[in-house]
Amino acid sequence: MVYKARISLSGTENKIVDVVCEEIKGIAKRTGVEIHGPIPLPTKRLVVPVRKSPDGEGSPTWDRWEMRVHKRLIDVDADERTLRQLMRISIPDGVRIEIQIKS
């Protein structure tokens, strides 16, 4: 039976997210299933301004810390063999993966 799997990847390092996308594309190519993506979604930018001086004295100077979250979306028409191989991918730290399966 052929399933439709929607794989969403997110992480703070875009190169690592792209490496995982290439692994998924390689599995899809080897098993001969149809793949759509990776579709780059908008990057979320989280900014936290922090006061440099801990005691509140002196001029108000601020540090701005920033974290960017990169997202990719991949749609795969997958059979059971492909899904098993997708589950066995080693995912590096800092990458979050979600798989939604529709029959």
From Swiss-Prot:
Superkingdom of source: Archaea
Pfam families named among the record's database cross-references: Ribosomal_S10
GO molecular function, one term: tRNA binding
Disulfide bonds, paired cysteine numbers: none
Keywords carried by this UniProt record: Ribonucleoprotein, Ribosomal protein
A GO biological-process term: translation
Gene3D superfamilies linked: Ribosomal protein S10 domain
InterPro entries (alphabetical): Ribosomal_uS10, Ribosomal_uS10_CS, Ribosomal_uS10_dom, Ribosomal_uS10_dom_sf, Ribosomal_uS10_euk/arc
Similarity field: Belongs to the universal ribosomal protein uS10 family.
Functional note: Involved in the binding of tRNA to the ribosomes.
Protein name: Small ribosomal subunit protein uS10
The organism of origin for this protein: Picrophilus torridus (strain ATCC 700027 / DSM 9790 / JCM 10055 / NBRC 100828 / KAW 2/3)
Protein encoded by which gene: rps10
